[in-house]
Structure formats: C-alpha cells, structure tokens
Amino acid sequence: MKRDYYEILGVSRSADKDEIKKAYRKLALKYHPDKNPDNKEAEEKFKEANEAYEVLSNDDKRRRYDQFGHAGVGSSAASGGGPGGFGGGGYADINDIFEMFTGGGRARGGGSPFSGFEDIFGGGFSGGGGRRARSTGIHGTDLKIRLKLTLEEIAKGVEKTLKIKKQVVCSECNGTGSKSGKTETCQTCHGSGEVRQASKTMFGQFVNIVACPTCGGEGQVVKDRCTSCYGEGIKQGEVTVKINVPAGVQDGNYLTLQGQGNAGPRGGAPGDLIVIIEEKPHDQFKRNGDDIIYDLAVGFPDLVLGTKVDVPTLDGHVKLTVPAGTQPNTMLRIGGKGIGHLKGGGSGDLYVRVNVFVPKDVSGKDKEMLKELKKSSHISPNHGEQDHEKSIFEKAKDIFG
C-alpha cells in the first residue's frame, strides 16, 4: 500500500508550497542516487519524494489527492514522472541540484525546485507523437474491509450481504467527469499520455519520458467539468455486496472480489474488493486447525462408573459416552463435528477434553460419604501396595453401589 504523500515529505496537510518545496529539497539532496551509489533503499526514497512533490506542488493534483487519495492522481503519480524531469529513470546531476538550490539556476517550468535546465524543445514538453494508445481513465484503487465471522459460520461456510462505502461512478456525468459526457484528446501529448523532456547537465544531455502535465497521463482532457464530482467521474457512495465465504477459512485469510473495489476516475477500471477474515472468539470451543476442542467437567463418581452426557457441537447437541475409569484430561473424539475443510472433502473432528468437577461447597451428608470413601485404602494413588485384588474403580463401584 502506498504511503501518504504528506508523510513522505514530513509536512502537515496544511503545509504551504514553500514548506513542501523545502521538505522536498532536503530529501532530494539526502537520497539522490549520485550521493548514494548502489543503494536501492535510497533510490526508492528519492523516487517516493519525487512522486509526492509532483502531486503536492500542483494545486489541481493536490486538491484531487486531498479529496480522493491516491485514486485521484493514480495515473500521473504512478508513472514515476518526477518534477522538472527527474522521474522516469533519469536523475539530474547532484551538483546541478545544489547549484539550483543556492540560486545558480534560472527559474522556469512552473516553479519546480529543480527548474533551470535548458530544454531543447524550448517549451519544456513536447508531444509524444501518439506512440501508443492510452487506456481510458485511471485504474481504481483496491478497497479492504474486515469481515467478522463466528465459528459456526466458518464451519459450514456462509453468504454475507454487506453495505460498504466506496468510490462509485458519478451518475451525473456517467463517470466521464464532463458535463456533456465528452472528453477531448490532449493537445500536448496528442493522446499518448506521455511527453519527452530533454535537459542538459554538465555530463551531457538526457531525455526522460514522463506523464503529460496537461492530462495527468490520461491522454484525454475534460473541458466542461462536472460540478457534482469536480471532473473526477467518481463520488463517495454506498453499495450492497454479497460475499460467499467457503467453509474452513481462518483468521487473516482474505477473499478477493475482482472489480468490486473503488471505481476508477473518468472511466478507469475499478479496483478489487479485498475481504479480510476475522474469527470471533467462541465462548465454548477452541479451534485447532479444522478440529475443535470442548472442555467437559464430569463428577468423580461418573468418571469412576462411566456415564452418558449431552455435549454441544457447532450444530446442536449429541450424546457422548464417558467410559468407566476415564482419567482427567482424556480426549474423547466425535468424528466429523469439527470445521469443514477449505478444499472440501469432509470436516474436522470435535475433541471433548474430560476433566473432573470438584465442588466448592458440599452438604453434610456428602461430606460423610466422602469421609467414608476416604477410609478406603484403594482410593488414594498409593493403594497398590496394600491390596492387589481390586482396582480403585472397582472399590469405588462397591462404595457408590
């Protein structure tokens, strides 16, 4: 996910142009490739600063970015075209940058902090000559949402219907950004969305291919902007989506719904909707892969003599037989009562962990019975040396009848 442009430059959202320019100059000098040879991290930071400044130094792009985020400037920003011709893979010599910072260069090209290079085309930019066709509009951004599910829903799979807020196509202009619904071919780049910019440095001349500054890299311009969407072709709206979640998903898994993300400005293709799964904690069961675990407390007499109990599952109750002589922490398995496998082909199991129930308060009669039971030499763990004829469970059966 792209970082916030204000965060990249280290300025507030209310920063004026001078503050933005100063912040950019500082970063450009610090991370310039000439100063950091073979340093990929510095190169990426330099590109980030270029991209951020290209947007925030332009009033129209900054307004669109403040309103729509990266989606509003996606095409021009993503092109890598830096201010004053420093994007697109070419970098000015750092000595020239320093000279311009200290006032040694001639200011031209709309106030770029790196302006001052002599452009061989005379006007700063020339048309791309229609080298290639441009796709319509800017691609919409992906939208991420979180979906909380119960263990019961995860076990069987579920269909969810949700209302989500996202950028939708403007109904007033049908997404064109134009009142009349029409756009015109950009006269600067002749529809290619790109221009060539040539500059001279102390090491010679270099040429960059950058996004057209007139159309933002789209190849089309809007003359009569729609007043409802300010010429963007998209607005904030609310839509209803259906999400089919298969059985067996886990916390952190995600589903991608192609084309259901934010609409693209001015007819651009929509982004994707990314649904991140969050599993709600369950008050009875613990999950272990596709198996689930349930803790069952059973009284001591039932552990000794055996019993049948009702056990909850994810889809109702079942009868479980606790065999006589079951030891604490024994796991009893109920097959197929776990969570459906994500790839199909059955379900996990339910494991019942049996523990002994110890009451905090007992009646006088119960105390007398326990005292009588305690007298038995076979009720304590070291009874084996005293009597080998009957086991502890056989003795307990005799006492409890």
Swiss-Prot record:
Zinc finger CR-type: from-to: 157-238
InterPro entries: DnaJ, DnaJ_C, DnaJ_domain, DnaJ_domain_CS, HSP40/DnaJ_pept-bd, HSP_DnaJ_Cys-rich_dom, HSP_DnaJ_Cys-rich_dom_sf, J_dom_sf
Presence of the UniProt keyword DNA-binding in the record: no
Main location: cytoplasm
Subcellular localization: Cytoplasm
Chain positions recorded as Zn(2+) 1 binding sites: 170, 173, 226, 229
Mapped CXXCXGXG motif repeat ranges: 170-177, 186-193, 212-219, 226-233
GO cellular component, one term: cytoplasm
Cofactor(s) required, per the database record: Zn(2+)
A Gene Ontology biological process term: protein refolding
Co-factor binding comment: Binds 2 Zn(2+) ions per monomer.
Binding site for Zn(2+) 2: 186, 189, 212, 215
Keywords: Chaperone, Cytoplasm, DNA replication, Metal-binding, Repeat, Stress response, Zinc, Zinc-finger
Alphabetical list of SMART domains matching this protein: DnaJ (SM00271)
Free-text function comment from the UniProt entry: Participates actively in the response to hyperosmotic and heat shock by preventing the aggregation of stress-denatured proteins and by disaggregating proteins, also in an autonomous, DnaK-independent fashion. Unfolded proteins bind initially to DnaJ; upon interaction with the DnaJ-bound protein, DnaK hydrolyzes its bound ATP, resulting in the formation of a stable complex. GrpE releases ADP from DnaK; ATP binding to DnaK triggers the release of the substrate protein, thus completing the reaction cycle.
Domain note: The J domain is necessary and sufficient to stimulate DnaK ATPase activity. Zinc center 1 plays an important role in the autonomous, DnaK-independent chaperone activity of DnaJ. Zinc center 2 is essential for interaction with DnaK and for DnaJ activity.
Assembly with partners or alone: Homodimer.
Family annotation (HAMAP family): DnaJ (MF_01152)
Protein family (similarity comment): Belongs to the DnaJ family.
UniProt protein name: Chaperone protein DnaJ
Organism whose genome encodes this protein: Chlorobaculum parvum (strain DSM 263 / NCIMB 8327) (Chlorobium vibrioforme subsp. thiosulfatophilum)
Classification lineage: Bacteria, Pseudomonadati, Chlorobiota, Chlorobiia, Chlorobiales
